[in-house]
């Protein structure tokens, strides 16, 4: 077993095997099994070529814990992650070119998710399961297409303050607002179908008092 540390998280590589091809025109076979100390497993099985770099592999992520990554969320939203795990099952491709090409096709899910408003220390967003089925992502040109999004038992809190501001406005981190203004590039997002099961919302309009 080999243990490495990346982004302050420890990874244990249970298996990392590259089967070299004698025919240099053919890519090598790749198989990898990575266990995360914070919870979760990443598996790869496919092809690898080193010059130029090319990866063509099946990607499977099982029960990847989100809480250890909460510091990255704060750069986007003023939320504290309380729980949540990610599961991914699909096909990943990358090829090194003048403009690098990358794509993913498969299913992505987040389960047992809960996040609190940092300022109020109240539950802001939660769900039992959120699954993106038939997700297609590509790097160049950047786009995301999803056949269906299924949300089971989602919850959110919507509060209108006395000054008529909405609590959603206060969640976005100032750094994220600045980056949004400076970044003119947009990413097309298309979702064919959304299904919500047993959702709930806490709503209050304090501007009426």
Can you say where each PLM-predicted feature lies in the sequence?
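Membrane-embedded beta-strand positions in outer-membrane beta-barrel channels/transporters
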Residues: 15, 41-43, 87-89, 129-134
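Outer-membrane beta-barrel domain signature
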Residues: 21, 33, 77-81, 121
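Acidic/polar low-complexity surface segments
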Residues: 164-167
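Extracellular/lumenal and peripheral-membrane lipid-interaction modules
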Residues: 61-92, 149
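Elongated, acidic membrane-bridging lipid-handling scaffolds
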Residues: 1-73, 94-96, 101, 175-209
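A generic secondary-structure boundary signal that marks alpha-helix termini
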Residues: 78, 139, 204-205
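Short amphipathic alpha-helical linker/capping segments at the junctions of internal repeats
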Residues: 128, 169-176
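Flexible beta-edge/linker motif
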Residues: 1, 57, 82, 91-107, ...
